[in-house]
Amino acid sequence: MTESGSYKDTVNLPKTSFDMRANAIKREPEIQKFWEENKIYDRLFENNPGELFILHDGPPYANGSLHIGHALNKILKDIINRYQMLRGRKVRYVPGWDCHGLPIELKVLQNMKSAERQNLTPLQLRQKAKEFGLATVDNQRQNFKRYGIWGDWDNPYLTLKPEYEAAQIGVFGQMFLKGYIYRGLKPVHWSPSSKTALAEAELEYPEGHVSRSIYAAFPVTSLAEAVKPLLAEYQSDLGVAIWTTTPWTIPGNLAVAVNADLNYAVVEVSQSEAQSKFKYLIVAADLVERLSSTLGLELTLKATFKGNDLEHTTYRHPLFDRESPIVVGGDYITTESGTGLVHTAPGHGQEDYIVGQRYGLPILAPVDDNGNFTQEAGEFAGLNVLGDGNQAVIDALAAAGSLLKEEPYPHKYPYDWRTKKPTIFRATEQWFASVEGFREEALKAIATVKWIPAQGENRITPMVAERSDWCISRQRSWGVPIPVFYDEATGEPLLNEEIINHVQGIIAEKGSDAWWELSVEELLPESYRQNGKSYRRGTDTMDVWFDSGSSWASVVQQRPELRYPADIYLEGSDQHRGWFQSSLLTSVAVNDIAPYKTVLTHGFALDEQGRKMSKSEGNVVDPNTIIEGGKNQKVEPAYGADVLRLWVSSVDYSGDVRIGKNIIKQMNDVRGKIRNTARFLLGSLDDFDPEKDTVPFEELPELDRYMLHRITEVFEEVTEAFESFQFFRFFQTVQNFCVVDLSNFYLDVAKDRLYISAKDAFRRRSCQTVLKIALDNLARAIAPVLSHTAEDIWQYLPYKTPYKSVFEAGWVQVEEKWRNPELAEFWSELRKIRDKVNKTLEIYRLQKTIGSSLEAKVVVHVFDERLRQRLQALNPNTHGSVEKSNGVDELRYLFLASQVEVPSEPIFEEGDDAGIYIQVYKADGEKCDRCWNYSTHVGESAEHPLICERCVAALAGEF
């Protein structure tokens, strides 16, 4: 006779050394070392049979530490790359860095004493900037690798490398030779604080900017023929009324523009209230009422006419002795604000410049690099246009009787993105890329690209359709030089194919420092050295957007293992006006095609409340703290890279995304659930040899075949999620599969089969057959996201596998024959009944009628006859059940109860909606000492009097 409690060693409990805790701070670096030592990334590139897949990296700026936006971006890229590797494609990912430009220059200058700065040569500055950039690259590279990002980290692309710079000069050269690059005096965004021109992408428009706006009038000196008869009587006291938010541009005024199609009016000003000297004003007819209240003047309508008729009327400048014309502008002139007549200064505005060109007006911009008025501004010379210069102009207009009103005007105004100070529009000699020359081709190219989300196309299309020519020159020394020389005598630029090729060769060999190191003679081709002229080298460098925008040529086209155009570019949505656009423009200008086939964009990372992150708010989430933990590990535990990666997969990145302590904690819980599920699977397969223990599909019990159907559905949904880049669908599906399908259902039901049966029993091996399929596929499916966890699982597989790494095992594998919608429909119904049974058992448990569910006998009354008969068929102890039980598809196992009855004549309670009524009684018989089920057969075996008939059979190897 066996005594109580001594059966515990006869039960097959799960066995695995796979740790329940992730212990990521120790385990992840070990796994990364395993990948590196076994060269998994390189081996996949060599051995994968599929075609190339090239995701081209948009270069982060080599300045400062990584933030959560960097993590979001790089992890998204890595998820895509790893998925493509698992699908068998050859993936080569070359990370890059943007290393030139003003921000790095400013960092270097900020770290120097002002005395040092005074004596700094361009070459010394470049040397310091290079050192700073390279140190940042090293720091960022280490962090990116810790995120688990795979790539060519030993051979990244840097925009400061000679081979990169030379290819960039090549792009510039081809654009120049096609006639797309020219030098011109044009108004550009000028930053007095940085003393350089800026491109659109280098501007920001902070909230809260208020300008001093003024209404002013200029005296009419002659009338156009079309309005002479109508307006002659008012001419002696007539002024054209304008409105501007930049009074300092009035010294540059050379015209007033009207809209040809708008109606204009002459109004009489009630003299008592007027502070200006004009009795009559010309304004837009639709604005008379609004202006009357804004200016606080009574305005009486005298005559109306079309804007077109005003063309060639002239007026006198209120502050300078010159006459200027009224001209017809474009549809930028509206009655939304102002007076309907626009003060036009061709040296200070884009539209002004275009209109000025049409009328042959000179370009006047009496402002220097520092933002101070020049001698051309007469009495205002030396004053700063954004400060006392603005005030002086307003005062002078008032003194001249020209000012009608001044009022503050809040609006969006461009600031320098680095110095955070306002910019001005100012005409300077610059180098431009003429977008006009290839705009149509660029728009056509946009239409060939797949944009995800689709509205990306609607963002970039109007930007390219409406953008002005691209100012590509910068007055700074840390960058790639524009390879031009100027004739000392005439100032004429010298730039042609021979010059470009010669300079390109020098830079390929020596790097762009050579432009500053070598003499002009050495930089010039032989034929220009002794031709009787003397030249000086240009001092401008290229816009950094031209640097990064040339990466398709410097990297994708130049490296033999890559392929142009790239399959995909993926960056933040701000890059529609940045890198996506500069890359598109250069690629189309040179090759007539887009440099990418697909463009994917993501939003920005906000805190948990949806606020922007800022140091002052104290709501900045540092990716490094998530991975390695903070100073106080109790408050900020080390979660490891996989939790950060899981967060990236959980958000809908097509818009802005949120992150914070609570969200990260949730992610850690989800990873825990996935690990626990995997651990149970590993432990339950400890003694399973797939070669000899696998049960053929046709012989599997219904429950197992249903589970394989679910596995097919789940992993198809996961595949679809990765294919469509909707990783949040992967996150939801896998989490749901682990918790709802496995833990709460299949594994819950399986424990009896796995623990209680004989090791080799059919009911146990059939279950293990399904568990192996679930485990292999779960590891593969999470590998793109939870890369370390997946590899960890793979390294603990208890059975032989031909694949050293999960990434060599390929993608999930499901079979078409597993799909069985009819079976699934019935089992879904069963699962609903199971939920109902569980709820009822819970009520009885709370009433203390039963303890565990095994203490219960469950009676299920089913109203629907067809369903009742199907349930009875799964219940061997129901009268009328003909099939012998397979020890799996029984209701008692499904409900975890000791006995289940399905009466042929059901009874009903009122209010039962689903036609199912459940009763719970205490189970019949005694508790088995081994499986804890209740049975009326406990005690029948003389050898084992304390256990039930199932356990007696199991010990004999028969169950």
From Swiss-Prot:
Reactions catalysed: tRNA(Ile) + L-isoleucine + ATP = L-isoleucyl-tRNA(Ile) + AMP + diphosphate
Gene Ontology cellular component annotations, sorted alphabetically: cytoplasm
Domain of life: Bacteria
Family membership noted in the UniProt record: Belongs to the class-I aminoacyl-tRNA synthetase family. IleS type 1 subfamily.
Name the UniProt record assigns to this protein: Isoleucine--tRNA ligase
Transmembrane segments: none
Binding-site residues, L-isoleucyl-5'-AMP: 571
EC number(s) recorded for this UniProt protein: 6.1.1.5
Source species of the chain: Nostoc punctiforme (strain ATCC 29133 / PCC 73102)
Domain notes: IleRS has two distinct active sites: one for aminoacylation and one for editing. The misactivated valine is translocated from the active site to the editing site, which sterically excludes the correctly activated isoleucine. The single editing site contains two valyl binding pockets, one specific for each substrate (Val-AMP or Val-tRNA(Ile)).
Keyword Nucleus (UniProt): no
Oligomeric form and interacting partners: Monomer.
The gene coding this protein: ileS
Swiss-Prot/TrEMBL GO biological process terms: isoleucyl-tRNA aminoacylation
InterPro entries: aa-tRNA-synth_I_CS (IPR001412), aa-tRNA-synth_Ia (IPR002300), Anticodon_Ile_BEm (IPR033708), Ile-tRNA-ligase (IPR002301), Ile-tRNA-ligase_type1 (IPR023585), Ile-tRNA_ligase (IPR050081), M/V/L/I-tRNA-synth_anticd-bd (IPR013155), Rossmann-like_a/b/a_fold (IPR014729)
Gene Ontology MF annotations: aminoacyl-tRNA deacylase activity; ATP binding; isoleucine-tRNA ligase activity; tRNA binding; zinc ion binding
Cofactor notes: Binds 1 zinc ion per subunit.
Subcellular location per the Swiss-Prot or TrEMBL entry: Cytoplasm
Cofactor dependency: Zn(2+)
Residues given in the record as Zn(2+) binding sites: 928, 931, 948, 951
Enzyme class: ligase
Listed SUPFAM superfamilies: Anticodon-binding domain of a subclass of class I aminoacyl-tRNA synthetases (SSF47323), Nucleotidylyl transferase (SSF52374), ValRS/IleRS/LeuRS editing domain (SSF50677)
